[in-house]
Structures are given as structure tokens and as C-alpha cells.
From Swiss-Prot:
This is Glycoprotein hormone alpha-2. Belongs to the glycoprotein hormones subunit alpha family. InterPro entries: Cys_knot_C (IPR006207), Cystine-knot_cytokine (IPR029034), Glyco_hormone (IPR000476), Glyco_Hormone_Alpha (IPR052680). It is found in: Secreted. Transmembrane segments: none annotated. Keywords: Disulfide bond, Glycoprotein, Hormone, Secreted, Signal. The lineage of its organism: Eukaryota, Metazoa, Chordata, Craniata, Vertebrata. It comes from Rattus norvegicus (Rat). GO terms for biological process: adenylate cyclase-activating G protein-coupled receptor signaling pathway; cell surface receptor signaling pathway. The keyword NAD does not apply. Glycans are attached at residues 38, 82. Functions as a heterodimeric glycoprotein hormone with GPHB5 able to bind and activate the thyroid-stimulating hormone receptor (TSHR), leading to increased cAMP production. Plays a central role in controlling thyroid cell metabolism.
Amino acid sequence: MPMAPRVLLFCLLGLAVTEGHGLEAAVPIPGCHLHPFNVTVRSDRHGTCQGSHVAQACVGHCESSAFPSRYSVLVASGYRHNITSVSQCCTISSLKKVRVWLHCVGNQRGELEIFTARACQCDMCRLSRY
């Protein structure tokens, strides 16, 4: 192989590898992580007192899978449970209270405690009842 085509081939391979690393950086980090978000708290619908705070939420992706059920599961379910799925959800594993200072009409001040996430984990998915 002459020298010029060989150099061109290495340059193209280098470009392809470099481009691949750029794409990996755009993919979200796997797992379940704390994520900050702004919260505005009001004492009533009229906003007589209000304040803001950066609270923490749990955001991310956890593992899930589905596969054909074992024969024993098929028999036990009367051949109705033919797919077994396993999944976990990103959840708050511990909370903490934080104090939010409220600014009120007439230069008054107040305070209110709210909950924020302290730690996150991938755990069993549960139905929410809010």
C-alpha cells in the first residue's frame, strides 16, 4: 500500500474514533442520582408570603428486564404467566427537612420546613399515592 492512502486511512480511523467519544458524552450517566431543582413556596394562594429554595430530587435510570418464564412458573400460573419481568425504579432512599425563609407583605419574615432528597437508590417500584 502506498504511503498516502495509508496515512489517509489512519486519519479516517482517528476521526471515527474521535467522533465516537463525542457521542458517548451525550448519553446520560446510568444510575439514580440527586438532581437539584428550584422550589417556590407560598403561604397561601395570594402569595402573602413566599420564598424559594434549591431542593433535591432523584432522577435517573435503573435496570429492568423481561424474559420467558420458567416451566415451574408456567405450571403454577396455569400457563397464563408466560413472561417474567423484573424492574427497579429511581427512588428517594432518605429525606431531610430544610428550612425555607419566607418574605411576606409589609417586610415581615416567616419560615417553613419542606422535605428534600438526601440520598437516592434503585429500588422496588411502588405505586404512588399522592
